[in-house]
Amino acid sequence: FADLLRVNLSVLRRIIRTEHLVQDVAQADTEMKTEYAICYCKNRADSAMVIRVRRALAAAKPELLLDSSYFVPWLLPGKARLFTPVSYTERPAVAAAKICEGKIVVLVNGSPSAMVLPALFCENFECLDDYASTAVFSSFLRILKYVSFYLTVFLPGVFVCLAVYLPELIPPQLLYKIEAAEKATPLPLFAEMLLVILILEVIREAGLRMPQSLGHSVSLVSALIIGDAAIATGLMSTPVIFVASITAIAVFVTPSLYEPATLLRLGVVLAAGLAGPVGLAGAFFAVLLSLSGTACLQVPYLAAHPFPQRPIAEDGIIRRNYRRLSAHDFNIWQKREGK
């Protein structure tokens, strides 16, 4: 969405050529009177949810409205949450696909991204390109994304827990190398893991804030130099840097979950380092509780089915071919309310 609001709306209209597409344009209650639009298909979206969204946006009073994300505190009031049950996209084709699923899209004048609500946890592991690939390959990619997310959250904590509290579960040869490396470092294992994770986050943030022509090179060179110097001086061990590097790379497989995954990774390492297996189990249930307690527009974030009337085996972790998927309507509301 690279143009003004009216042009972006016309782009959506050209993709969704149906009289059921509704585009409600309104002005925000701000000094600049910024325009925004609520887009949905009236034969697919739930009318009660549309009314709720319209009222929430009309009651919102942000000081400035530069992006659709400014509406989130009014759409999702209440407690702080790690996972936000809304998603964003800059691709008109993705926004059109979400509208056809029965979702609601919010566009703001001058903003390149559109807000889609409600969002489901499983959708973080899906993308529009999945449907351009074969069913087998896209299913493989989805499995890879799920594995990468759980690796980036739990792998450092599991490593700390096994190395400190349950070393008998580690193969002897690997355990010998870990112990030999840890004897040369002055920090406890979990503190060392936290330090490596924080250093990698600093390097990543520095690379993002620098000019694009230098950012990637600086990040790569910094990681190599700091890692080599840390091992040479005995401040950090090779196994810890290896595990932290795997998690730092795996988090980019699901970029929409980067923020919660980073915070959860730190929390899991702390819990595993301080309380061992009990802390690790507690962290797992805390993550599960956070996910299960999140909802948007009365749609649970952990809804089992992207589209309730379609079996999860057809478009879940494993995807069937698009011809079979097209035999069902793309509507997330239909069976939830017994229609």
Give the location of each predicted region.
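Cytosolic regulatory modules rich in charged/polar residues
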Residues: 1-192, 297-328, 332-339
